[in-house]
Regions:
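N-terminal Rossmann-like dinucleotide-binding module
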Residues: 1-43, 271
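Conserved acidic residues
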Residues: 32, 61, 138
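Predominantly a Rossmann-like dinucleotide-binding segment in NAD(P)-dependent oxidoreductases
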Residues: 119-188
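Beta-loop-alpha module in the N-terminal Rossmann-like domain of NAD(P)-dependent dehydrogenases
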Residues: 44-105
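Active-site loop of classical SDR/Rossmann-like NAD(P)-dependent oxidoreductases
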Residues: 14, 242-244, 257-270, 283
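Contiguous beta-strand/loop segments that form the cofactor/metal-binding neighborhood of enzyme cores
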Residues: 174-247, 270-280, 296-299, 312-314
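Rossmann-fold dehydrogenase core element
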Residues: 100-118, 136-140
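C-terminal helix-rich "cap/oligomerization" subdomain common to oxidoreductases
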Residues: 1, 52, 62-65, 211, ...
Length: 314
């Protein structure tokens, strides 16, 4: 069987750092084009827009859409209408309701729509799910704090309406949470902290639960400097189970159970190749529904202005 010929649309940091090496490392996948207004990749055909690429570019089977979520829906719809398989970076769209028409369009065209959650493919996530299946969980604490200036340098879109703000990384934690816990979850309380010069939150504190009343506390913050925190602690009757470093490590109490190399995006592309071989879609909106809950229920708090270039004090 020939390789799945993939084009990347939107060639920013995540595409360059994660998608390109993952495609290169995935059997049955090859990168044949890039569409981006501002960036290119040596040795790969480049086009300024996806429309130009579809019209004048090489034969492609699929597109990986890596542009900001605010503009993803229209590009996804155009690619599906052209009969191309579509991979959506997370979050799949700027809103929840805009995804259903894309699912219908993929079904009608007989192609794959894959809404990706890369953190679910972290090496410790599935072992954690299996371990927790035999435990009674009493409470969950999520601490997901990072420095936006390091991970999204100069990317103003992330603080625009529809850019998700701190929920751009925070949704990674929610994607893990909704994978490892067996019951549907919902937000019961949210405090959202908006810089007074921005349209999306820079920090958020959430209370989440399930129908059995499991208490889950999530703290997201884009202002953390120094060591970064991507941890989920499950307190069980048999002791704590902790996912750390975004799901790279798993601790059962003090015992390190999993400590593996990151291969999240390779996992995504293996899944994409498999889905496209069967023209099947994979669209789970549970993580984004929790974000929508947070914006619906959230109390807004105004905090200091944010600029990507930190103020230098004399």
């Amino acid at each position: 069987m020939s390789d799945l010929r993939i084009a990347i649309v939107g060639f920013g940091k995540i595409a360059r750092d994660q998608h390109v090496p993952a495609i290169a490392a995935t059997p049955g996948a090859s990168l044949v084009a890039v569409a981006s207004r501002n960036a290119s990749l040596p040795g790969v055909p480049h086009f300024r827009t996806m429309a130009e690429m579809l019209r004048d570019g090489p034969a492609i089977d699929a597109v990986a859409l890596c542009m900001p979520p605010q503009v993803r829906r229209t590009e996804a719809a155009a690619a599906l209408a052209a009969g191309k398989h579509v991979m959506l970076e997370k979050p799949p769209g700027a809103s929840v309701s805009e995804i259903a028409p894309l699912v219908a369009a993929a079904d009608k065209a007989g192609v794959t729509l894959f809404a990706t959650w890369h953190s679910r493919y972290a090496p410790a996530v599935e072992p954690a799910r299996q371990l927790l299946a035999s435990r009674r969980i009493e409470q969950v604490t999520i601490t997901w704090k990072e420095d936006v200036r390091v991970w999204h340098p100069g990317q103003d879109w992330i603080f625009e309406a529809g850019g998700f703000g701190v929920f751009d990384p925070g949704i990674n934690a929610l994607s893990i949470l909704t994978r490892v816990l067996p019951q549907p979850l919902f937000v019961t309380k949210a405090d959202l902290h908006f810089p007074y010069n921005r349209a999306a939150p820079i920090a958020a504190d959430l209370d989440i639960s399930d129908m059995d009343g499991l208490p889950i506390r999530a703290e997201f913050d884009f202002r953390q400097t120094g060591p970064q925190s991507w941890d989920i602690r499950f307190d069980t009757t048999e002791g704590p189970v902790t996912l750390s470093l975004g799901g790279a490590k798993l601790f059962d109490g003090d015992t390190l159970v999993v400590d593996a190399k990151d291969a999240e995006y390779q996992g995504l592309y293996r899944r994409f190749v498999d889905l496209t071989s069967r023209a099947r879609s994979d669209v789970d909106l549970a993580p984004q529904l929790l974000v929508a809950d947070a914006f619906t229920l959230g109390q807004r708090h105004v905090v200091d202005a944010f600029e990507h270039k930190a103020e230098v004090k004399a």
